[in-house]
Amino acid sequence: TRRSSDLIFRKQLQTAAEECLIMRKDTYQDCLVLYPESAWNEQMNELRERLNRWDPTHQTVFRQFVSDVEIITLDANGRFLIPKRYLKMAHIEQDVRFIGMDNTIEIWAKEMADKPFMAPETFEKELQEIMGTPIER
């Protein structure tokens, strides 16, 4: 299924001169995550720094993290192809919703993304707790 990235995301990618995107299934949610190549490289560098190459569990976690990655290129119209196996992983059957998440873009099945991700009172409580915590610098 070929999808067109939202105009705002397309402009950001063009401004950043990103050649390709990296797609993987989110670790915790049933959505897909698109990383600009530079953001993916940053995350990979951070993960590598934390890994103990001599720890078999670390190796397995690393292998799992990178094993199901797809390199995505945008065509001249800003469209890209989502492989069928990714559509299945994210339960995407038809319409999608793009959600900007800092330096990545999540792709959700529209019917899943249109529902609240958490109850409003839980969201308020969690946001208050996060924003009330001093930033460590």
Each model region followed by its residue ranges:
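Short, small-residue-biased leader/transition segments that mark boundaries at the very start
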Residues: 1-4
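Long, hydrophobic N-terminal alpha-helical segment
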Residues: 7-12, 136
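Extended intrinsically disordered, low-complexity coil regions enriched in Ser, Thr, Gly, Ala
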Residues: 12-22, 26-27, 88-105
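Short, well-structured hydrophobic secondary-structure segments
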Residues: 16-18, 24-43
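Helix-adjacent hinge/juxtasegments
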Residues: 33-71
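Polyanion-binding surface elements
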Residues: 75-76
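Short, Lys/Arg-rich amphipathic alpha-helical interaction segments
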Residues: 110-137
